[in-house]
């Protein structure tokens, strides 16, 4: 599939670095090569030495076909709506807050390990890789499914990311989605708008569906003028959709004309 080739061609060409090492100044390249000799870069997905994400892991990504995904929640295998969104009253938070939702891949090997390495193990070099996956997905969706995702990227006035809580920022030392968003905007040429601030301190990963929705409600505040803007809201993982729905609802409350969601992975 051509979409696989696009991802492989751009990402694998970078090797173990986020960008091709031939563009590094000679001194930096020598330092990098010395460090690689002492402690080789290992794949975030399988620990194989040589590249930050190896070719086997890239080709193992379970990419979601935008022609057959749920436009409400980004789940795979929903030609119109997925089995959850097609039931009255289900996933209503995402359906009401987001105009459309698009996801890159199913949250299955190797993505959980890659995302964990980036968020919790401090492998910040993965940000451009994940941004590239988001960018490729949006471009592909516009062409492959124009009736569903036309202008999802080209029609966006700005990109907004789901921010980390203050507690998560302190724990990790950086906002993981801000770094991805900056790389994504460099690729796409769309402006970045740091529009949201998130309150709250809890980790949602161990919460159930209803608990996540309650936890996410009221956590966000818009701190930039988004009135009349068409926004592309990005995040890493959609599980129940509560986090993205709450962020999108806040942007709509602040006057955004439209909010589309884009995420790296979809739990399904």
Language-model-detected regions and their locations in the chain:
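Glycine-rich phosphate/pyrophosphate-handling loop used in enzymes and phosphotransfer proteins
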Residues: 1-268
């Amino acid at each position: 599939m051509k979409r696989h080739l696009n991802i492989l061609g751009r990402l694998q060409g970078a090797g173990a670095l986020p960008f091709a090492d031939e563009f590094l100044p000679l001194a930096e390249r020598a330092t990098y090569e010395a460090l690689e000799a002492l402690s080789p870069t290992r794949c975030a997905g399988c620990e194989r030495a040589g590249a930050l994400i190896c070719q086997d892991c890239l080709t193992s990504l379970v990419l979601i076909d935008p022609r057959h995904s749920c436009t409400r929640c980004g789940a795979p295998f929903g030609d119109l709506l997925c089995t959850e969104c097609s039931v009255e009253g289900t996933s209503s938070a995402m359906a009401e807050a987001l105009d459309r939702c698009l996801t890159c891949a199913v949250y299955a090997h190797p993505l959980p390990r890659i995302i964990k390495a980036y968020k919790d193990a401090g492998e910040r070099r993965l940000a451009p890789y994940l941004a590239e996956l988001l960018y490729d997905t949006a471009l592909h969706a516009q062409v492959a499914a124009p009736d569903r995702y036309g202008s999802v990227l080209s029609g966006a006035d700005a990109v907004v990311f789901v921010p980390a809580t203050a507690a998560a920022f302190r724990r990790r030392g950086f906002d993981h989605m801000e770094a991805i968003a900056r790389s994504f905007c460099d690729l796409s040429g769309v402006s970045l708008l740091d529009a949201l601030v998130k309150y709250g301190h809890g980790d949602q990963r161990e919460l159930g569906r209803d608990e996540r929705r309650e936890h996410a409600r009221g956590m966000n505040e818009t701190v930039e003028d988004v009135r009349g803007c068409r926004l592309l809201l990005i995040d890493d993982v959609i599980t129940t959709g509560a986090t993205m729905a709450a962020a999108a609802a806040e942007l709509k409350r602040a006057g955004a004309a439209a909010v589309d969601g884009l995420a790296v992975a979809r739990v399904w």
